Amino acid sequence: MEPVERKLEIGSRSYSKMPLTQQRSSGEPPRLKATPKDELHDLLCVGFGPASLAIAIALHDALDPCLNKTPNSNWQPKVCFLERQKQFAWHSGMLVPGSKMQISFIKDLATMRDPRSSFTFLNYLHQKDRLIHFTNLSTFLPARMEFEDYMRWCAQRFAHVVSYGEEVIEVIPGKTNPSSTLVDFFTVKSRNVETGEISARMARKVVVALGGTAKLPKELPQDPRIMHSSKYCTTLPAMLKDSREAYNIAVLGSGQSAAEIFHDLQKRYPNSKTTLIMRDTAMRPSDDSPFVNEVFNPERVDKFFSLSSAERQRSLTADKATNYSVVRLELIEQIFNDMYLQRVQNPDETQWQHRILPGRKITRVEHYGPHRRMRLHVRAVKDEKDSLVGNGKETLEVDALMVATGYNRNAHEQLLKNVQHLRPAGQENWTPNREYRVELDPSKVNAQAGIWLQGCNEQTHGLSDSLLSILASRSGEMVNSIFGGEFAGTTVPDTTHIRAML
């Protein structure tokens, strides 16, 4: 019998040198159509982070005849993505040297939806000629830096339909026929972050995927030396420029970002004093055990969505240790080892170069200008029985305070303020259905128009909503929800006459 290796070699050098997906896509025309500003778009996405990028990929794949047996060959969607950043970036401020992903590379932007896609992480490695080298790492967890590069690689394929440096400022309902009672499109206004120029684009369907905004405790004043963890790698080095200087730096928080920053500071500024302040009594390990990890399975969204409000809240609380205020065990052990070595040298913790203050909170910050250190007033928090958890009060003088206290995910509320009157009577919140489509009054909005929310639906769709885990499968659901009729061959109405309305 002929060896399998020999069979693969015969007449098929491309099998080992170039995947079929690359052969198919290398010379293919763009499947998403760049559209002039004054034309009506089929889809406009506000934000071009991982969620919108996954939608672009899913839509591209849905139009690929090699992957989809029944695409409407006569239809090419008019789409646009507006992104405030000047280029694609994913948590650029937290690309800490040595940091790894916390999920398997198989949960990339395409594999779980269709592993034949040319946008898989494995195909990225192949295109970069690193597949065998990555395999030799024997890991499912790539470096965070590499995974961001993978997403940049994907994003480059859609550069023709993305307008970077455009900050969306409002969404306004519109009517093709002014005498009609039904809204049938939305005008999306954006501001160029460099020139301030205002642009307007119209779209039948709008996806709002803004991501999170930095959450800062109200006790903290406005001061450039107080910065969110999302700016750690980009802003702090520009402010504290001398890596040999003996700075005093504090970190606030008890989750993965806080731990990574605290650990990295000790290498980035080896002569500096660092202090980690946390309300919790200790760093707690994240639970990524197999059964618990099933909470991030795509089908669990259906189960979570079907629960009552009270049941959803209980579920979120029960699974909190998978994502909130927790740290990977490997990093906890590294930090504990560092603390132990200090204890060997000096049992007095107050004299340590690097300290952890558990059970504490910052109550007040004194700041007197850029040339004097800030003074942090720290005291012990109280538990449910009104008992002190930490050890009383303490004052710290610091050159910088890194705040790793998470993100708010409510930016869509201000953006959609002009659409509020279209919600069903008596509904005060932005309520998405299972397909992430916002519930709007059908007596006011045409079924052809709609708004979808991404990354802000944890209360209705579960813990995975703002994470990468289900992006691949969810993006397929989104494309089906938004464009299902077009893929089935439904006639798409001619909208070129709307151009004159802008």
Curated annotation (Swiss-Prot):
Molecular-function annotations in GO: N,N-dimethylaniline monooxygenase activity; ornithine N5-monooxygenase activity
Q: Which EC class is the enzyme in?
A: oxidoreductase
The cofactors named for this UniProt entry are: FAD
Q: Where does this protein have compositionally biased stretches of type Polar residues?
A: 13-26
Keyword set includes ATP-binding: no
The Enzyme Commission number assigned here is 1.14.13.196
The record's cofactor note says:
Binds 1 FAD per subunit.
Q: Name one GO biological process term.
A: ferrichrome biosynthetic process
Q: Where is the composition biased (Basic and acidic residues)?
A: 1-10
Keywords per UniProt:
FAD, Flavoprotein, Monooxygenase, NADP, Oxidoreductase
Residues the entry annotates as binding substrate? K107, N293, E294, V295, F296, N323, S469
Q: What induces it?
A: Induced under iron-limiting conditions.
Region Disordered, annotated ranges: 1-34
The record's family statement is: Belongs to the lysine N(6)-hydroxylase/L-ornithine N(5)-oxygenase family.
Q: What does this protein do?
A: Catalyzes the conversion of L-ornithine to N(5)-hydroxyornithine, the first step in the biosynthesis of all hydroxamate-containing siderophores, such as deferriferrichrysin.
Q: What is this protein called?
A: L-ornithine N(5)-monooxygenase
- Where does this protein come from, organism-wise? Aspergillus oryzae (strain ATCC 42149 / RIB 40)
Q: Which gene encodes it?
A: dffA
